[in-house]
Structure formats: C-alpha cells, structure tokens
Design a protein with these regions (language model features):
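Alpha/beta-hydrolase fold nucleophile elbow
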Residues: 105, 186-198
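Non-catalytic accessory segments of hydrolases
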Residues: 1-166, 190, 375, 398-411, ...
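Substrate-access "cap/lid" subdomains that shape
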Residues: 181, 215, 220, 224-354
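Catalytic nucleophile serine of serine hydrolases
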Residues: 197-200, 212, 225
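Active-site loop->helix "elbow" adjoining a glycine-rich segment at hydrolase catalytic centers
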Residues: 112-113, 167-171, 199-202
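Short glycine-enriched nucleophile-adjacent loop
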Residues: 202-214
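Mobile gating loops/cap/lid regions near enzyme active sites that modulate substrate access
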Residues: 35, 324-325, 350, 354, ...
Length: 482
C-alpha cells in the first residue's frame, strides 16, 4: 500500500492558545503529536503551557514515569509500545481529516492502566488514524500524571497541596479545557466532545462525571471495562505514607519531596507502601474524594449536573482471563470458572447501568466474541479496543476469519453513531433501546450480534457471594498491568 506524507513550513500549521504548532499530513490526515496542554510542579495543579516559536508536533511527547519499569505481559494478546518517560507529560495527540471549519465530532481517549500506569500510546490499538479517517471525526489522546505524581493526597500539609490527591484528574480537565478552546481550529466541534476510555480510562470517565470542574467540557461518555468493584481505598489521609517517604528519603518536609529525583521517590514508595496498604492506609494511586472529586456514584449518588449526559457502558466476557494468573485457554476452563473471569467487572457494571438509568440515558454492551489464538480464548481485558478504533489490522490476535470485518464495523459504527448523536443505534445492528432501572438492554457483540435483556443477571447474582469471598483473599487490582 502506498502512503503519502508531507511536512512543510506552511502546512499543518495551527495557532493555539499556547502558541503555534506544526504537525504533518499523512494519508489524508493532519496529525499532531505531543502538544503541551499544561505544565505543573510536582504535586501541584496544572497551569496552561505557552511557547513563543512554532512547536514541532511531529513526534509523541513524554509519558508519565511509572513506579516500576513496565514488564511485557501478554504481548501476543495486547501488543504494547514503550516511550520516553518524564514528569513533563501533560501533552496530547490529534488526528483530524482536515484543518477546516467542519465541526466534526471529537473523541477524547483516556488510556488504561488504572490510575498508576499506562500512556496514550501504550497499546498499538490506540492509534487514532483509522478512527479519524473512516469516521470523519477528530480523535484526541492524552497523557497525564499517574501514581503518586497524580494521586498522592498531601492535603494535611498545607493549602497548596489541597488537591494533590487528584492532580492527575486535574490534568485531564486541563486537557479538556484545551480541547474546548482549540479543537475548532483542528476541524472539531467543541460542543460535541465524547470522552471514552477502557479499564482505568473508563474509570476516569466515571470520575469526570463526579467532578464539578469538568462540567460542560464533554457531552457524552463511553466506559469500557471501567467500573471495577474493588479499588484501593483513597478516602483517608495520605499523611502516613508521606511521613514514611520523608523518613525513608531523609526529606525534611513535603517541599523536599518535590525535588527528589523521581527514581529515588519511586524506589522509596515501593519500599514503604506495601505495609501501609496492608494496614489500610491511603497510599495514593487512585482519586481522593474531596470537594474536587465527589466520590464513587455507587456510594455517593450521581451528580444531578451530569445525570443527563448519555453514556455507553460495557465489559468483555473474559476480562482478566489472560492476566493475573488466569492464562488459560477456553478448553482448560470449566463452566464454573467462566463466571469468575467477568464478574469482577460485570456485576458492578450492571449496578452502575441500572442506577444511571434512573436519571439519564445509558446503553449497555457486552463484548462476547471468542478468539482463535492459542487454541481458543474467551475475550480478554482490552480485546475490544482494536474493534472500537477500527484497528484490528494492527493486532494479529484480533483477526478471526469470517468474523472480524463485520464485527469490527458493527462496533465502530456504534461508537461513531454515539459520538455523533448520543445514541449507538445504526442500521448494521438490531434495535438497541437504552436501559432502564428494571431492564438492562445489553447488546452482545459477537459473530451473531444480538440484544439480550438482563443478560447473565441471575447467573452472576447466584455466583457473586462465593466469588466475592475469593476475590477479597486473592485479588489485588494494582497487580494488573496490561
């Protein structure tokens, strides 16, 4: 296949609120990578980024440093990419069909990895080219602060650290403000922004709905495997963790922690955090409920200000089937094993959908397609991402003879229909009504896509008590790295 590329001084040049940026033209798209949307001191709120000369936006920006070096995990199933890490990671990428005034729908991708890992380019399936070209939309992906850089509560140490436990969420909001103020120059509609994400990225969508500062910055949300029943408890003070870090590093105060080299900070954290976590202390790495973030809606109710925002919410059948010790092919799993593999996500997702349906439109989906790789596998956590981005061609494990082309188009068209109209219905799938508090109208996406009201409700309810007890003993969500 022949490709076209151009990058000239006067081409793909856009003036933004921070300064001018130059991207490049590739196969009919204007592409911009690594645009700074903010800057921030460690543990502090982000501020707008500005520059004087034309910024070269032709390569990806830094990604957030991790607490541990990434380990290859399931590369055949979820191909990864790794990149330069630095705390100056507040940057975004844009794919757009044209720099015009077409006011295309805008889709802003929030990456997975919990709140402690991942990046905007971690998975090859995150590439926005096909979505932008085939969907005639503008795709944005962002990097932001993670782990103790983004979610370390230091509010006990002074007003300047009042929201350090949500610095990563504050970065995301800064990126959405940048999109609001600049995306029209990239051919997008600032009045039609959909935030979508998978796993930790999906959880970030639910967090934004509970964050008043995000109001008006997005208009629809897609939550893919993002409602998890058991996360780290970050409701308490982070004082104990901070004091343990200061003692380990010989730092006199929090200001000294701001200047410690990140590698030393991460090493100290990895040394002191396990015992603190075991003792039930707040060790960071997840949003901290306060006036900025109002907490999990399943515990604290949905905010009325965002209750009418349309949502598309779902999971995949296997979820952690391929990770965290569940590396079994389908022939090795008994019927009793299978509910365990999806109930961690599916059960709280079902509750979320029903509760959300009390106040606003929400559509339910379930990715149910088995794969042929390694003798046959149930769909795993992340296996739906290539279908959403129309990127199955980039992920060999996603290619199923006689199935993938149609299934990919069904899912992709549902996502684009939702981004355009707030309803995922399109001509290539059965009638798909929104869910109600009494009935979860779930679209099962597989080789025979169909609507399945209240899918697996009775099965999961019956299995939940035993499974919950097992998970409480054996499951640590921080151990998952995809």
């Amino acid at each position: 296949m022949a490709h076209t590329f151009s990058c000239f001084a006067d081409a793909s040049l856009v003036r933004t609120t921070g300064g001018s940026v130059r991207g490049y033209r590739f196969d009919g798209l204007d592409i911009f990578k690594g645009i700074p949307y903010a800057k921030a001191r460690r543990f502090h709120a982000p501020e707008p980024a500005v520059w004087d000369s034309v910024l070269d936006a032709t390569s990806y920006g830094y990604v957030c440093p991790l607490l541990e070096m990434p380990k290859p995990n399931g590369e055949m199933l979820v191909p990864h990419r790794y990149w330069l890490m630095d705390e100056a990671c507040q940057n975004l990428n844009i794919w757009t069909p044209a720099l015009d005034d077409a006011h295309r729908p805008v889709l802003v991708w929030l990456h997975g990895g919990g709140y402690f890992a991942g990046s905007s380019i971690e998975q090859i399936a995150y590439e926005g080219e096909n979505m932008a070209r085939l969907g005639d939309c503008v795709v944005v992906s962002i990097n932001h602060r993670l782990n103790i850089l983004g979610y370390f509560d230091l509010s006990d140490f002074g007003a300047e650290y009042a929201n350090s436990g949500n610095a990563g969420g504050d970065d995301i909001i800064a990126a959405l403000r940048w999109v609001r103020d600049n995306i029209a120059a990239f051919g997008g509609d600032p009045g039609n922004v959909t935030v979508f994400g998978q796993s930790g990225g999906g959880a970030k969508v639910t967090t934004l709905l509970q964050t008043p500062a995000a109001d008006g910055l997005f208009h629809k949300g897609i939550v893919m495997s993002g409602v998890l029943g058991r996360l780290a408890d970050c409701t308490g003070s982070g004082r104990d963790c901070a004091e343990a870090l200061m003692a380990e590093l010989g730092a006199a105060d929090i200001a000294a922690l701001e200047t410690v080299p990140y590698a030393a900070l991460a090493a100290a954290y990895n040394k002191v955090a396990p015992a603190l976590k075991a003792a039930g202390k707040n060790t960071g790495c997840a949003p901290h409920p306060n006036a900025f973030y109002l907490g999990d809606p399943l515990e604290n109710a949905f905010r009325p200000e965002t209750a009418r925002i349309p949502l598309l919410v779902g999971t995949v059948f296997g979820e952690f089937a391929a990770f965290n010790g569940f590396g079994l092919n389908k022939a090795q799993m008994s019927a009793a094993d299978l509910p365990f593999l999806d109930v961690l996500f599916r059960e709280p997702t079902m509750r979320y959908i029903r509760r959300r349906a009390e106040t606003g439109p929400v559509w339910s989906y379930f990715f149910n397609q088995d794969f042929t790789i390694e003798g046959g596998r149930a769909p795993w956590h992340c296996s739906d991402i290539p279908f959403v981005f129309h990127n199955t061609e980039l992920v060999p494990s996603a290619n199923i003879s006689g199935v993938t082309p149609q299934l990919e188009q069904q899912i992709f068209d549902a996502v684009l229909a939702f981004a355009r109209t707030g309803n995922p219905q399109h001509s290539g799938i059965p009638t798909w009504p929104a869910s109600t508090p009494q009935q979860e109208n779930t679209m099962l996406f597989d080789s025979a896509t169909r609507l399945a009201p209240n899918h697996d409700k009775a099965l999961i309810a019956a299995a939940l008590p035993a499974i919950s007890a097992l998970m409480a003993r054996n499951f640590d969500p921080d151990s998952i790295q995809h």
